[in-house]
Amino acid sequence: MYRNWTELIKPHTIELGGDETEIQRKATLVAEPLERGFGTTLGNALRRVLLSSLQGAAVSTVRIEGVLHEFSSVPGVIEDVTDIILNIKGLALRMESTGIKNIYLRVDKEGPVTAGMIECETGIEILNPDHHIATLNKSGTLDITMTVTTGKGYVRAQLNREDESYAIGDIPIDASYNPVKKVAYRVENARVGQQTDYDKLIMDIETNGVVTPEDALALAAKILQDQLNPFINFDDVPTAHDHEMEDRPQWNPNLFRKVDELELSVRSANCLKNDDIVYIGDLVQKSESEMLKTPNFGRKSLNEIKEVLDEMGLSLGMTLDTWPPENIDDLSKQFEEENF
C-alpha cells in the first residue's frame, strides 16, 4: 500500500525568485519535479486557498467626526467620505493578537494625509505608511476612529453592521482580511534523467507585505494538509521496506546509470570507454585534470561532460564514500526501475 505515495516523485526544493527589492511582497516560487498532472492539481488547490483562507487584519468599521453615513462630505477635505473609506480599505495591517482594537487619525494640517499619521494601539503595525488617505485644505480637520478586527477572506459591510458592538455613527465597511493580493500559476515540463514529461509548477504570488509570498504558500500548504488528514483512515507505520530504504545510502540515482546512456559525442564516449569508466558514479569521482590526461580527451569534451553532469545535479571531482557498492549491478537495475 505504501507504494501509492512513496514511489511518486516529489519536488527536490522550492526555489524562490523575483526582484530582490520587492521579494517581501512579490515572488515567483518553483516546485519541480512533480508527477504528470500534479502541477495543475496542486497549483489550483494552492491558489484557491491562498486567495480565500489566510488570516489577516483589516478595518471593519470607521467613525468620522461630524459624519453619520458614507454618502457625506467632510468640510475642508477634498475627498468625500466614500473615497476616504476606499483609501482606508487599502491599509496593510499586521495585528499580533486576535480580537478588536482601534486606530486613530486626527489631522488639522493642510496637505496630504497618509497612513503614517495614524496612531495605533499596541500590537498593531501599518506596513504601508505612505498610503494616501485624504487631502486637507487650510480649514480642514479630520478625526477618524477605525476599528480593526481579524478574520479570513472578504467580509461584506452588511455583515459587519450586524455585529453587536455596532453603534449609531459607526460606518461599517467591507473588510478584506486576506494578505494575498494576486496569485497566478502555470505548469511547464520538467526533466528527470532522460524523461521530460514531468511537471514544473510555477506560482507568482503578490501580498500586501503582512506575510511574504514564501510564508503565504507555506500556510496554504499547511491548511490543505490539515484539511486532508481526516480522509486518511490508516496509520503510516514504517515497513521492512521502509527500513531497508533508510539504511540504503542516499545516492543520486543518476550515479547508477551507465555512461553509454549519455548523449555524448563519439570522441567523448570512446575516451570514457577506453578509460574503463562504466558508471556515472565512476565518472564524477574523476577530477578535471585527470580527465584531461586521458588520451584524445580535450577541453571541448570536458565542457560537454560537465554540462551533462550539471543537468543531473552532479559534477566532476565528487567524493563518494563506499563507492562502488558490492551489488552495483543489482542496484543499477533497481534504481532504474524506481526512478526511470
From Swiss-Prot:
One of its GO terms (molecular function) is protein dimerization activity. One of its GO terms (biological process) is DNA-templated transcription. Residues 251-340 are annotated as: Alpha C-terminal domain (alpha-CTD). GO terms for cellular component: cytoplasm; DNA-directed RNA polymerase complex. SUPFAM superfamilies: C-terminal domain of RNA polymerase alpha subunit, Insert subdomain of RNA polymerase alpha subunit, RBP11-like subunits of RNA polymerase. Keywords: DNA-directed RNA polymerase, Nucleotidyltransferase, Transcription, Transferase. It is an enzyme of class 2 (transferase). Residues 1-235 are annotated as: Alpha N-terminal domain (alpha-NTD). SMART domains: RPOLD. Its EC number is 2.7.7.6. It comes from the Bacteria. It catalyses: RNA(n) + a ribonucleoside 5'-triphosphate = RNA(n+1) + diphosphate. Belongs to the RNA polymerase alpha chain family. Homodimer. The RNAP catalytic core consists of 2 alpha, 1 beta, 1 beta' and 1 omega subunit. When a sigma factor is associated with the core the holoenzyme is formed, which can initiate transcription. DNA-dependent RNA polymerase catalyzes the transcription of DNA into RNA using the four ribonucleoside triphosphates as substrates. The N-terminal domain is essential for RNAP assembly and basal transcription, whereas the C-terminal domain is involved in interaction with transcriptional regulators and with upstream promoter elements. This is DNA-directed RNA polymerase subunit alpha. The gene is rpoA.
